Swiss-Prot record:
It is found in: Nucleus; Cytoplasm; Mitochondrion. InterPro entries: PsdUridine_synth_cat_dom_sf, PsdUridine_synth_TruA, PsdUridine_synth_TruA_a/b_dom, PsdUridine_synth_TruA_C, PUS1/PUS2-like, TruA/RsuA/RluB/E/F_N. It holds the Pfam family PseudoU_synth_1. Gene3D superfamilies: Pseudouridine synthase I, catalytic domain, C-terminal subdomain, Pseudouridine synthase I, catalytic domain, N-terminal subdomain. GO terms for molecular function: chromatin binding; pseudouridine synthase activity; steroid receptor RNA activator RNA binding; transcription coactivator activity; tRNA binding; tRNA pseudouridine synthase activity; tRNA pseudouridine(38-40) synthase activity. This is Pseudouridylate synthase 1 homolog. It comes from Mus musculus. The active site is at D142 (nucleophile). Residues 32-75, 403-423 are annotated as: Disordered. It catalyses: a uridine in tRNA = a pseudouridine in tRNA; uridine(38/39/40) in tRNA = pseudouridine(38/39/40) in tRNA; a uridine in mRNA = a pseudouridine in mRNA. Pseudouridylate synthase that catalyzes pseudouridylation of tRNAs and mRNAs. Acts on positions 27/28 in the anticodon stem and also positions 34 and 36 in the anticodon of an intron containing tRNA. Also catalyzes pseudouridylation of mRNAs: mediates pseudouridylation of mRNAs with the consensus sequence 5'-UGUAG-3'. Acts as a regulator of pre-mRNA splicing by mediating pseudouridylation of pre-mRNAs at locations associated with alternatively spliced regions. Pseudouridylation of pre-mRNAs near splice sites directly regulates mRNA splicing and mRNA 3'-end processing. The modification Phosphothreonine is found at T422.
Amino acid sequence: MGFPRLWAALLRNWGRWTARPGPRVPGLPPMAGNKVPPALASHQPDRKGRGGWVWEETEHPAKRVKGGEDEEPPRKLPKRKIVLLMAYSGKGYHGMQRNLGSSQFRTIEDDLVSALVQAGCIPENHGTDMRKMSFQRCARTDKGVSAAGQVVSLKVWLIDDILDKINSHLPSHIRILGLKRVTGGFNSKNKCDARTYCYMLPTFAFAHKDRDVQDESYRLSAETLQQVNRLLACYKGTHNFHNFTSQKGPREPSARRYILEMYCEEPFVREGLEFAVIKVKGQSFMMHQIRKMVGLVVAIVKGYAPESVLERSWGEEKVDVPKAPGLGLVLERVHFEKYNQRFGGDGLHEPLDWTQEEGKVTAFKEQYIYPTIVSTERDERSMAQWLNTLPIHNFSGTALGAADTGAKVPSSLEGSEGDGDTD
């Protein structure tokens, strides 16, 4: 039999071929790696058989087995630098910043990090070491202080429906309202040009000292509102605010702060009580600075302090400046004007402008922040209690002279620390 006939016979019998160990037929290529018919997949010959063909099953990729169940290998998604627009009611929290090792003091970041892990945005070990996700907040709001426009920067996995998934693991009084991609080296604190805070207070705080401390029928007159705005405008510009914090000396350069604007809006009535909102925009603020700025203006309008105390407070002399309660303080907005000028129009990055989220911000304030301030003021009377302490301050002398009187502000009013945008 010649070779052509032998080759034809082999082809005719190919369908009935059965793999067996043994010598390979001369002239035929090795069959290792060819796909095995299903009937033969479970009957593989011994790989050690000399000259035998080895059938390999390659249809199913390898899977990890955990707990007796097949588990797909984890996806490896690239991390991206983003910013989140946050709103929260600060009541019941010990500020924004997480304090690792102090689990008894619950913070806003505790709930946020937990939600990020549960949503699948960050691995679990990033929750214990926030540096791994390059986390930074714009402002370190303190105990009891709320925010309508806080911004944090971090690296996350950009999963589908990311905002909905994060919010599903957050309490209703903490919301993520927006997300934007930013440059890889973006730092929300360092890139922030200015911050806008608002301070909501009952207008009876501006009533003359001869009236009842808590007169709920009081309504702010146009003349008094004009006086308030005239005094608040005095803060505009650069001044030495060492008397408005406990952290700075009169000659420390960092005590000088630049205020862009400060004014009081038209009053409004909630639950029969009239309120007003003071807004202040500045490059940065020190601990308690805004509360003391409000407190000193209230003392002047009520008739406890002369207007000249404002100028004295910016000098090197130590001046007794009262600190208003922390209840009404809210971080309203943060500004990134220089970043937007450089990257906002480059075609690669979005400007950090939250105009489209304004409706959600307003709705959150109306649903969570303002009602909390109103109800807490009615229940705890924090402003009325603080107003009762104003007569014990010595506005004509120095702060040292006031301390000699032995006067002390009730500890219940010290619970809510201030704005906390410290260096």
